[in-house]
């Protein structure tokens, strides 16, 4: 979530988990380095559909098929309903313009086509305007199980269905607004909140744990791992989440947080950010 200028040293307690992880790696994948947007990206109907090679569509089909073998019994109702509402194709890479139109019909969100991981200010600005930044390239066949940077499968299949849920959609806009006001140690705190909700969140439904985080629903390994006995679960608590700085972004998660409802997510986030003067 951070892309500091090369001549700026970030205090240790203000570094993001991604910055820390990159410092510990010998070779940094250039896809994990955020890019600054040069002007407004294409939005909605202005997004052109790429001329994908058939291999990319086949990769998409493999990814969707693998996940859909597991998700119906593990993902939350809002996610599964979101997939239906967006009519996400299983046999070919969807059109961002079409997804944007359907998303707009559901909750007033649209899609912005971005080149990859983008600078945090650009990212937060788009969220604050109810515009979801999405790539349009799909990972290579050699990265079916894991890709260090977001691709269109993670963005479309992982994130977009949840943006059809009204409370989650409102929360994500609030997140963008609060993040634009964050300074110092509040920046990595917000990154942790994002990580343990948007990316790796769980929710309790009908007495059972269900998945909604994009980092889980788009990962074949995380889907089974997240609901296994190998993971320590905590009740949703914003104060606990924002101070949890011992997680690793490039490994399976061994601790997760469980919501009781998406209304709880909105209320908890609004209360914490208001106390911090971010909203």
Residue ranges, per PLM feature:
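Generic structural "secondary-structure junction" signal
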Residues: 159, 177, 202-205, 213-214, ...
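Residue-level signal for secondary-structure boundary elements
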Residues: 111, 115, 165, 180-187, ...
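Short, hydrophobic/amphipathic alpha-helical patches that form generic packing surfaces
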Residues: 101-105, 155-158, 173-177, 192-202
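A structural motif
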Residues: 163-171
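Short runs of predominantly hydrophobic/aromatic residues within well-ordered alpha helices
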Residues: 96-100, 150-153, 168, 190-194, ...
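Extended, Lys/Arg-enriched charged tracts that mediate electrostatic binding to polyanionic substrates
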Residues: 177, 181-213
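A recognition module on extended beta-rich or small alphabeta surfaces enriched in W/G with H and D/E
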Residues: 216-278
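The feature captures two recurrent sequence modes
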Residues: 1-163, 241-243, 257-279
């Amino acid at each position: 979530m951070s892309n500091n200028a090369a001549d700026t040293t970030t205090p240790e307690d203000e570094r993001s988990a991604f910055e820390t992880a990159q410092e510990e790696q010998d070779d940094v994948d250039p896809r994990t380095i955020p890019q600054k947007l040069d002007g407004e990206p294409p939005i909605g109907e202005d997004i052109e559909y790429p001329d994908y090679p058939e291999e990319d569509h086949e990769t998409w089909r493999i990814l969707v098929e693998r996940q859909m073998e597991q998700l119906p019994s593990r993902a939350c109702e809002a996610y599964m309903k979101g997939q239906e509402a967006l009519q996400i194709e299983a046999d070919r890479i969807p059109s961002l313009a079409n997804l944007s139109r359907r998303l707009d019909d559901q909750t007033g969100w649209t899609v912005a086509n971005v080149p990859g991981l983008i600078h945090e200010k650009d990212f937060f600005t788009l969220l604050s305007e109810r515009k979801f930044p999405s790539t349009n390239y799909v990972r290579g066949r050699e990265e079916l199980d894991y890709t260090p940077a977001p691709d269109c499968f993670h963005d479309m299949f992982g994130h977009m269905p949840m943006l059809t849920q009204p409370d989650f959609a409102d929360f994500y806009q609030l997140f963008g607004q609060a993040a634009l006001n964050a300074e110092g140690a509040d920046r990595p705190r917000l990154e942790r909140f994002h990580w343990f909700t948007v990316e790796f969140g769980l929710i309790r439904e009908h007495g059972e744990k269900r998945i909604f985080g994009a980092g889980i629903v788009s990962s074949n390994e995380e889907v089974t791992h997240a609901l296994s006995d190998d993971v320590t679960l905590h009740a949703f608590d914003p104060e606990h989440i924002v101070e949890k700085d011992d997680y690793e972004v490039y490994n399976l998660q061994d601790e997760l947080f469980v919501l009781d409802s998406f209304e709880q997510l909105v209320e908890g986030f609004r209360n914490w950010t208001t106390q911090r003067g971010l909203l």
